[in-house]
Amino acid sequence: MVWLANPERYGQMQYRYCGKSGLRLPALSLGLWHNFGHVNALESQRAILRKAFDLGITHFDLANNYGPPPGSAEENFGRLLREDFAAYRDELIISTKAGYDMWPGPYGSGGSRKYLLASLDQSLKRMGLEYVDIFYSHRVDENTPMEETASALAHAVQSGKALYVGISSYSPERTQKMVELLHEWKIPLLIHQPSYNLLNRWVDKSGLLDTLQNNGVGCIAFTPLAQGLLTGKYLNGIPEDSRMHREGNKVRGLTPKMLTEANLNSLRLLNEMAQQRGQSMAQMALSWLLKDERVTSVLVGASRAEQLEENVQALNNLTFSTEELAQIDQHIADGELNLWQASSDK
């Protein structure tokens, strides 16, 4: 039976122009970092993608190494794209990235032209696509000249394998340099993807949003819920069904060390504020990011389709009073949750 998308899907989502480009992204985008590997049930993935699109979420964000195992998120997404979304390809924004370890040997990681372009070809093959809408340099590579990384990104566009290019976890200074390098190729930098949330404000402290605005670059925030800390699930310890319980210290992600008393106190105060606003803590955290028009979109993950419905309700209240913002700032001690600092502080 052929699946048909909700005909009213565009009536309930906000869309924002990405920097100075003509491309608009949904205020909420779906990230496939977790829950889309071969270890996850395909039908659960299908339900999440269908629900997202039915809610007007048109942007699906991947990377070469998402899984587990690495590459499996792209493979699964490609299968579901063929089975359910083939007729809707021109209504989708599909992004992928390369930068972290992907295959053995000296050419399977980093920012070299060799790695980035080979990885893009592999990603297209896994997803069954002729092009992606956005291709990212996933991280700063200290051992590769930025000129080389920029040339690879430019080639991705010139070869028709990507419509736009972006960067992730670059400092303001490196972002400015990438803008200038791509300009030499007559390729605009479309978007920057930083880790940004109520508990991790390096984007504010560093002036990154000003750099992006001054250069007409969009911003899409990842880990907007601090990888689950801002959902409220950890207020009373570590639940057995939580990612922190499952993963421990095995991967870059949540660790029990993040549950400091300062962080827990911040979370409890935020939860009280959210209730006063008639929102869940997760909804308030998303609203807080989207109150700034310089933030084009926020990337949310989901293990269940119902979570997306709750997240979309955040768009109903993006207004904060001066008193609320001051109260948030007073409550929040920066939890030092920027796990990507090794890349973004350079």
UniProtKB/Swiss-Prot annotation:
What is the protein name given in its UniProt record?
A: L-glyceraldehyde 3-phosphate reductase
Keyword vocabulary terms for this entry: NADP, Oxidoreductase
Task: From the UniProt record, report the name of the gene that encodes this protein.
Answer: gpr
Task: Tell me which family the UniProt entry assigns to this protein.
Answer: Belongs to the shaker potassium channel beta subunit family.
Catalysed reaction, written as an equation = a primary alcohol + NADP(+) = an aldehyde + NADPH + H(+)
EC numbers listed for it are: 1.1.1.-, 1.1.1.2
Give the residue spans that cross the bilayer. Answer: none
Task: Report the protein's function.
Answer: Aldo-keto reductase that catalyzes the stereospecific, NADPH-dependent reduction of L-glyceraldehyde 3-phosphate (L-GAP) to L-glycerol 3-phosphate (L-G3P).
Q: Which CDD domains match?
A: AKR_AKR14A1
Instruction: Offer one example of a GO biological process linked to this entry.
Output: methylglyoxal metabolic process
Coiled coil ranges: none
What InterPro entries would the database entry show? GAP_reductase, K_chnl_volt-dep_bsu_KCNAB-rel, NADP_OxRdtase_dom, NADP_OxRdtase_dom_sf
**Which positions does the site annotation Important for catalysis cover?**
D61, Y66, K97, H138
Q: Which Pfam families match?
A: Aldo_ket_red (PF00248)
Q: List cystine links.
A: none
Residues the record lists as binding NADP(+): W33, D61, Y66, S168, Q193, T223, L225, Q227, K233, S303, Q307, N311
| Main enzyme class | oxidoreductase
**Is Mitochondrion one of the keywords UniProt gives this record?**
no
Question: This protein's superkingdom?
Answer: Bacteria
Q: Name one GO molecular function term.
A: oxidoreductase activity, acting on the CH-OH group of donors, NAD or NADP as acceptor
